[in-house]
Every structure is written in C-alpha cells, then in structure tokens.
C-alpha cells in the first residue's frame, strides 16, 4: 500500500490529506451559491476605479461577497472512517476563475485540522491548524482555482461549541490570477512584454535583494508589492514596507496574504510557484500624505523561503542608478531599471510637496498596476522609496513616482506615522543600513537550476521509426523511458529540502495517476538509488508553471546526484511532460533519462544531438558560503536584450555606444536576415523583425569597446 503524504499544497500549513467520510455516515451536502456577477462588468468596473485613482497602481482582481458562515449556521457534520467529526461546507460562485476566503475569530484548538479543496480534491490547501491562529483572529487563504471550493473542518470530538471560526468574505476572482488552464491569464491580462524577469542578467546587481520582495494580496481582492526590511537591531523582525494606498488600516494588514519567491527560475516567462505565502500582519506605522505603510508579519518567513531583509538609505542625495523589483499585474517578479538619477518631485495634490522620487524614464522594463508598494533600490541594493504610481507603461515608460524613504523616516514625530521608531530600535541614527540574510548553518537555504540566459522552456516530442508521435522526451511516452532526471553537483554537506518542476503538459482523467521523486547518487559510472523523496498525484499540479514539492524529510546525497521523476504510475490515457531547454551547443548536458532500465544522457540519445536540461529548480539547505544563485555573475553583461520572446520588436540596451555597422541578425543556418533599425539613443536601439519566419535567431551587436550576441525566439503576434 502506498501512503501519500504532503499532497496538500499551498501557503504555510501542516500538509496531510483530508479525512474521508464513512460511506454510511454521510449526510446531505450543504452548498451555498453566491449571487450571480459578470466578470466582464467587474473588469470594466475595475478599470473605472483605476482611472479614477489618478495613476495609483494597485490591482483589483476580485469581487468581495460579505458573508457570515460558521459551523453552527451552515454546512453539515459527518463522521470520518476513523471516527473524527467532519464539518463540510461548499461555496460556489459561478464564473469565478479562482476563489479565496477570509476567516475571522479564527481560533482552532490544538488537534483540529482544516482543509480547503476544489471539486474532486484536485487542488487542496492545508492542513491549517492552531499554528495558523493569530492575535487578530483573522486568517486569509491563498486562492484555489475554479468557481467552487469546499471547507472541511476536522475535530476529534464534537464539543458544545464548534464555532472556532467564521467565514466573513468570499472573494470571486474575475481576472484569473492562477494558472489553471492553458492561458497564463484566462482573461488575457498579464505583465506587458517589455517587463524584465528578475532572474535575467540585467538584474544581477540586485540578485540578493530580490528575495526581500513579495506580492501582497490585500483582503482577498487587491494585489500590491512590498519588501522585507532590516532594522538596526538586526534581529530579523519581519517588517514589510509597502504603500499606504495598499494597506491603510489594521483590518487590511490583518487580512493580507504575503507571497514570496513568485518568480521564474530563469530569464524567461515561465510562471512561478505560489506556495510560499504567509497570512496576516500587524500595522505598525502608516501615513497617507507620504503613502507608506510598515507592517509586521504575523509569522516570520521560514528558512525555506530564503528571506532577505533589505537594507535602506535615507540620504536625500539622488542615486545615479535605480531599480524597482515588483509584481506588475500580480504576475511573476519583474525588475525595472533606470540608469539616470531620479528627480525630487510632487505627485498628486493629496500628497506632501516634493515627497517623491520621480523616475523620468525607465531604461529597461516598466511598472504597472499591481506594482504599487514595490521597493526602489539604489545600486547598493538599499531601499530608497516605494512605488505610489505614475504613467509608465511599455509604450511610454515615463514618470513613475516613489514615496521617499528619507521623508518617511521621521517627517512626523508620532511613532505610528514614521519609520525611524521601528527601523532604528538601536537608536544609532544611521544614514544607511545594509541588507542581510539572517539564516545560517542548516537553515541557510538556496535554489539551484541549470536554466540560463538565452534558454527557452519547451517540449520536444518523440517520433518512432514510422514518424508517428510516441510521446515526450521529458514525459509520458511509448518508447521505454520510465524516468527523467536532472544531474546536479553540489560539493559539501547540503541537504535537499525540495524540488520545483516546470510542468509543461498535463492531461489527467484518472485520479490515481502519480509521480514519484527519487534521488540517485552518482559516483563515477555507478548510479544508485539513495531514496524515494516524494510521491505526488498528477491532479495536484498546475500546468505551464513551476510546482514546488517540499520533501517530508531532508535528503543528503553525495556530491553528484540525480533528481529523477518516475513516470511508471501514470495511468493509460493520462499525460505529463516537464519543460526543458534545447541547445545546439554547450554547456554540458544535464538532462538524463532511464530507458529500458539503463540511464542515458539526453544528448547522446536524441537524433538531433540537442544539449538540454530540465526546467527543475532544487531547494537545498546547509549551503554554507556557496552562492545561492546558480547563474549570478560579478559583472553585468555589456548588452541587454529584451524581450527574449519577440513578436516583432527587440530592444538592445548597452553600457557603451552602439556601432550600427556591428549590428546584424542571423538565422540558425548562419544567414543574415533583414530588419528595421530605430536608434532611440546612443546606447539604446530597437530592431523590428517583421516579415521574417518565426524561429530562433542570433542577434549580434558591438562597438570598439565590446561585442555581444544573444539568442531570441521570434513568434507570430496573435
């Protein structure tokens, strides 16, 4: 008998599986349907609110139904197969692309467990337990996909009082902030193409501080950005700085959900994992006229979140280079960069005069709705402001306004309206403070991937000798491949805590299909099984996204090892495939497969002799002084190309003047292809490739001081 542990996924929880109700003890299910709403109307209404906001940049994604549901007023009680008392209550809101709930008076007793799940338990959150209780009694849950969810509450004995919580809000997602269907955003709204993924080379200077940035879901319906900040006591107190127009009251702070590490693992638009979230915070300081709020998280981020506490600088001197890391449209983490000094400026009549740093034009990327509260960093990765709003977009990335950290410091003497009281408990009054990663030893964690700049995540089909499709090289197939694996080398005493898989394809009709994660030691030519690290039902994965699987027990392999995905328990008719890269040259192939009982590397097996690696990101702890980012480099690249997936226009930004005669584009046959050139400045050009056949191209650019080449993917504009 196989026992599946940890099938529940989502925010900080205790894992496990919902208990089954005894067949002879099942009562009538209780279902409540919310009043009908139109997603199209709600989107229109959201746009109207945005226009009236005068450039502020929060994102409204959900409609709130205020309710009062509790075990004494709704739902049905049953007995489980092992004698526990089970309360179930189903909520439906027709047309919702996801649902999330807010609880009040949330005070679970020590043995109680709560789960939330979609129809058929395809997606499960929990178990939530007494460790999720907070001083405020407010508890927010991450959205679950679809328009129906069930709350299951489990207690060992049916006491006289069972109202250990009240559901007070049902939030109907009309935009689609989860990746549940083939489109990354079902309503077609995601971050614009000029946005730069935070793991692109252009962001290397701010590599450490990116782990401070989080997406904030405010009361289940609005999305903003924020950042963990350090204080002079250097005690890892989990303060998050954001905008006042995002979190302005204690109620909003209590009902916020903070999502960390929501990003692509490499420089490409692969959707991130959404499981690293924490519910609730306490408002410490806020000031509407300077548009800042400081909150303290109810739960400190655990080591597996790899939290970094950003430093800050309260000097009034303007830095020469600025970057903002944020979540535009609530999408994966992006970065916008300005290589010029900002200007001191005013923004809107309701704010203090000259209370803002104005980015006059972004050199790379932009901000959008959802970016509100996002930090503005100087070149030393110190926070100098938080985004309030502005006019910037991809078409015209100009005029964004960031509330000044130096004014928020102590412009007002009231401790509830300033930052100094909270961020300088040591009373040393420094002008600046560096950021810090406080975890160490066994708690120091990092992530590792072989995806690199210039890669594209894709799926390669297999063909048999008759040219008939026989499945995927990195997934289910009819060609004898039973396991696919990624090879890692991590010298030291690191412990493996989990792995994130970039799932590219899922077809799941059989609820019993599952994947098994195995760890193999590699010693010379000998590959031996170390352990079975996890088993996960196929129904628990999101397609077209990274899916983090945290192991129940840490694994310590030898220095070189394989992280393998066993496919043998995928039932007939079901399909799964993991994204991978395809390279016509190095670096060394790290993608391996087990075929007919023996291990082979992908390069020597595929007829096109592609190199490759799986879209897999390893979570390891006890990493010592090793770099936690696989591809960070000490010096920025001489040229920056964006986007890497091009519909027509490619931008090239360089640190030195561009020589137009050095600029040419080749196809994979080495043939130069035509393009249209527009010089925006001495160091910024755009080339238009319209009329060329979709495919992979190599772009070359240079001057007397540098030369650079970059691979892009040209696609049709839909």
Question: What is each PLM-predicted segment?
Answer:
Residues 439-523, 555, 560, 566-624:
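Beta-sheet-rich sandwich/jelly-roll-like modules and their strand-loop junctions
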Residues 109-122, 514-522:
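Short, surface-exposed beta-strand/strand-loop-strand elements in extracellular ectodomains
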Residues 82-91, 477-490, 546:
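Short beta-strands within extracellular/lumenal beta-sheet-rich domains
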Residues 144-355, 359-360:
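Serine endopeptidase catalytic core focused on the charge-relay Asp
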Residues 227-237, 365-388:
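Catalytic nucleophile loop of clan PA
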Residues 4, 9, 507-509, 513, ...:
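C-terminal outer-membrane/trafficking sorting elements
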Residues 11-86, 135-142, 147-230, 439-472, ...:
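Protease-domain processing segments flanking chymotrypsin-fold serine proteases, especially trypsin-like
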Residues 271-277, 284-287, 377-447:
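C-terminal subregion of chymotrypsin/trypsin-like serine protease catalytic domains
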